[in-house]
Curated annotation (Swiss-Prot):
Biased composition (Acidic residues): 480-512
Biological process per Gene Ontology, one example term: neural tube closure
InterPro entries tied to this protein: Bromo_Brdt_I, Bromo_Brdt_II, Bromo_chromatin_reader, Bromodomain, Bromodomain-like_sf, Bromodomain_CS, NET_dom, NET_sf
Motif Nuclear localization signal: where in chain: 553-557
Effect ascribed to mutating residue 102 to A: In BD1-m4 mutant; reduced binding to histone H4 acetylated at 'Lys-12' (H4K12ac). In m8 mutant; abolished binding to histone H4 acetylated at 'Lys-12' (H4K12ac)
Domain Bromo: 73-179, 343-452
Protein name in UniProt: Bromodomain-containing protein 2
Keyword Magnesium included in the entry's annotation: no
Zinc found in the keyword field: no
Phosphothreonine PTM positions: 6
Bias (Basic residues) ranges: 542-564
Location (main, coarse): nucleus
Length: 798
């Protein structure tokens, strides 16, 4: 048909056909096609250009995205396909070939439209969803299936595009499996400014259709401006002849954009159409189809999503804030209770609340949406879900518990979130997409949870809890192999005790809540006891012992120094009120050394024999020492320090198997709470045992290990510290102190100051007795040194 055009007809009738002014404009065979919109001066055809224009191939018109004659709806399934399925597919790395219609001319596929009779792409489906083109979700799903089928039909199975389509189709089917089962039409809520919104919506729909249609027609890449008569009148609202569009586009494309679009969108709403006309200019002036579609597709969703956000707030806000409205309807008592609980939100729980808000935010919605709501096993056809998953968990439940202040600490919050992820890993196969989504979301959670701030210490109201964790943390810092587990146990114990105190203070809680909390606390205590038992039974490394020895040595030196200072103060005390004492000693004429020694114990008595000295010194020594105990009952009830408990635990572990039965018997006899426990599997927590029980255990263990019982006022020397180095150090220290004391005595031996000599010698003897007593549990070398030092002190004073 194109060959019938003769040269003498071209100057007149060619222009007429081109401008749509002659009768040939409507004839399809006489239409002259334009290869590109970028060439200027196309209106003056020549003989050379006519055959090139006539032989250029053409793309068929793209599928319609809006049809006023065909009614559309907004349903829950269509909204799910738009917000979830389309969003996930559109952002996928393999989605780029499917975002716009196949350009057979640009890609050099002349047979594409002969094989594929019904082209489809995701850009068309997306615009149809935005324009409410579909009546039911099945129509949209059919379009998706058509798009994938076209790809499989035209391409070879080994092509990359086929693999990309298969990946997208797999994601599509997985998303559709989570779609609501029953399709329900959503009521479109009209906002307050309904007139403006209605006009804006109508103008928006008109401008969107023209925006997508005009660039689609004008952007058939480098081929021809094909304007089909039945298509344009339905989309461009008030233009009767398609040739009117083509003529200004051909004459001046850059200047014709805004007037054309303003005219086309004028009947629905002129002001908005003008605004859209500005955007249309940017669309039509872009040279390539990809450049046209790329601004077109992001530019249209903001306009189309804006009214949808106003019309359909439940789906937009459902995942973010589902609980806030019911909280306003709570009774006053519950509101007061919640407000009181709100005040007790700790820093760590505030951090957890921020993590929860981030998990529910739009930033992570692409892979977090399966975890927003509880798994509806019946709707999804997962009949074995609740048989496999015994404790379901989801983010809405976590949010509800957080708002109701059901979490007492960050560990409970983290346990629920991790339970949700572990349920997903447990039920789904490892290669499932929802598992990958869970792992991605868990990475976000763990990264934020690792930045948990430390809880500030509260020294005032909890003396027990503040005393215990340092001990536990001390043990964890000393042990190199079991550091992390002991730290976690100490934190859990501290939180448990804080929780117990909170339970006592919150008298308004119901009995059911108390029972529930007590049960949870008992479970946590049981877990902590298991950890402590495992820690106490674990091997202790040698560096730990060395560190302990150094610490013990420092403590012992400090204690001895304090004892010496106390004795010196006691010596200084009696000196002041006795100035006339030297006169009495002069009158007595007892200037010998024996009199000084004998008069020392009684502080002023002149009689007595030397064999009474040990008894008197024993009687007078306890009042000088501040840490002594008067009776055995006080000794039994004296609380154990952390080091003593730890040493007792080590000693019990050293006992042979046949001796452990007696240990269990002692504990069960003295601890009512452990009487009903199984003797074979009893767990000993030294922090909960009475001091009397611990002392009885200590006596029994020492008797089994054949150790000497410690005196009440001495610092307990741990087992395994009888090395020669320590003995030599002690010996040197004792000798040095004795030399100091004897030197002081020798320098102050003058007749008028016998009373001061007596007090100095008494201080010396008390110090010697104290030092020898403190080293009584040491080896023979240290005991012999202490006895020899006491002999030398006696000889010096004699």
């Amino acid at each position: 048909m194109l060959q019938n055009v003769t040269p003498h007809k071209l100057p007149g009738e060619g222009n007429a056909g081109l401008l749509g002014l002659g009768p040939e404009a409507a004839a399809p065979g006489k239409r002259i096609r334009k290869p590109s919109l970028l060439y200027e001066g196309f209106e003056s055809p020549t003989m050379a250009s006519v055959p090139a224009l006539q032989l250029a191939p053409a793309n068929p018109p793209p599928p319609e995205v809006s049809n006023p004659k065909k009614p559309g709806r907004v349903t829950n399934q269509l909204q799910y396909l738009h917000k979830v399925v389309m969003k996930a597919l559109w952002k996928h790395q393999f989605a780029w070939p499917f975002r716009q219609p196949v350009d057979a001319v640009k890609l050099g596929l002349p047979d594409y439209h002969k094989i594929i009779k019904q082209p489809m792409d995701m850009g068309t489906i997306k615009r149809r969803l935005e324009n409410n083109y579909y009546w039911a979700a099945s129509e949209c799903m059919q379009d998706f299936n058509t798009m994938f089928t076209n790809c499989y039909i035209y391409n070879k199975p080994t092509d990359d595009i086929v693999l990309m389509a298969q990946t997208l189709e797999k994601i599509f089917l997985q998303k559709v499996a989570s779609m609501p089962q029953e399709e329900q039409e959503l009521v479109v809520t009209i906002p307050k400014n309904s007139h403006k919104k209605g006009a804006k919506l109508a103008a928006l729909q008109g401008s969107i259709t023209s925006a997508h249609q005009v660039p689609a027609v004008s952007s058939v890449s480098h081929t021809a401006l094909y304007t089909p008569p039945p298509e344009i009148p339905t989309t461009v609202l008030n233009i009767p002849h398609p040739s009117v569009i083509s003529s200004p586009l051909l004459k001046s494309l850059h200047s014709a954009g805004p007037p054309l679009l303003a005219v086309s969108a004028a009947p629905p709403a002129q002001p908005l159409a003008k605004k859209k006309g500005v955007k249309r200019k940017a669309d039509t002036t872009t040279p390539t189809p990809t450049a046209i579609l790329a601004p077109g597709s992001p530019a249209s969703p903001p306009g189309s999503l804006e009214p949808k956000a106003a019309r359909l707030p439940p789906m937009r806000r459902e995942s973010g804030r589902p609980i806030k409205p019911p909280r306003k309807d709570l009774p006053d008592s519950q509101q007061q209770h919640q407000s009181s609980k709100k005040g007790k939100l700790s820093e760590q729980l505030k951090h957890c609340n921020g993590i929860l808000k981030e998990l529910l935010s739009k930033k992570h919605a692409a892979y977090a949406w399966p975890f927003y709501k509880p798994v509806d096993a019946s709707a999804l056809g997962l009949h074995d879900y609740h048989d496999i998953i015994k404790h379901p968990m989801d983010l809405s439940t976590v949010k509800r518990k957080m708002e109701n202040r059901d979490y007492r600490d960050a560990q409970e919050f983290a346990a629920d979130v991790r339970l949700m992820f572990s349920n997903c890993y447990k039920y789904n196969p490892p290669d499932h997409d929802v598992v990958a989504m869970a792992r991605k979301l868990q990475d976000v959670f763990e990264f934020r949870y690792a930045k948990m701030p430390d809880e500030p210490l509260e020294p005032g109201p909890l003396p027990v809890s503040t005393a215990l964790p340092p001990g536990l943390t001390k043990s964890s810092s000393e042990s190199s192999s079991e550091e992390s587990s002991s730290e976690s146990s100490s934190e859990e114990e501290e939180e448990e005790e804080e929780d117990e105190d909170e339970e006592e203070s919150e008298s308004s809680d119901s009995e059911e809540e108390r029972a529930h909390r007590l049960a949870e606390l008992q479970e946590q205590l049981r877990a902590v006891h298991e950890q402590l038992a495992a820690l106490s039974q674990g091997p202790i490394s040698k560096p730990k012992r060395k560190r302990e020895k150094k610490e013990k040595k420092k403590k012992r030196k400090a204690e001895k120094h304090r004892g010496r200072i106390g004795i010196d103060e006691d010596d200084k005390g009696p000196r002041a009120p006795r100035p006339p004492q030297p006169k009495k000693s002069k009158k007595a004429g007892g200037g010998g050394s024996n009199a000084t020694t004998l008069s020392h114990p009684g502080f002023g008595t002149s009689g007595g024999s030397s064999n009474k000295l040990p008894k008197k010194s024993q009687k007078t020594a306890p009042p000088v020492l501040p840490t002594g105990y008067d009776s055995e009952e006080e000794e039994e009830s004296r609380p154990m320090s952390y080091d003593e408990k730890r040493q007792l635990s080590l000693d019990i572990n050293k006992l042979p198997g046949e001796k452990l039965g007696r240990v269990v018997h002692i504990i069960q006899a003295r601890e009512p709470s452990l009487r009903d426990s199984n003797p074979e599997e009893i767990e000993i927590d030294f922090e909960t045992l009475k001091p009397s029980t611990l002392r009885e255990l200590e006596r029994y263990v020492l008797s089994c290990l054949r150790k000497k019982p410690r005196k009440p006022y001495t610092i307990r020397k741990p087992v395994g510290k009888t090395k020669e180095e320590l003995a030599l150090e002690k010996k040197r220290e004792l000798e040095k102190r004795l030399q100091d004391v004897s030197g002081q005595l020798n320098s102050t031996k003058k007749p008028p100051k016998k009373a001061s000599e007596k007090t100095e010698s008494s201080a010396q003897q008390v110090a010697v007795s104290r030092l020898s007593a403190s080293s009584s549990s040491s080896d023979s070398s240290s005991s012999s040194s202490s006895s020899s030092s006491s002999d030398t002190s006696d000889s010096d004073s004699g």
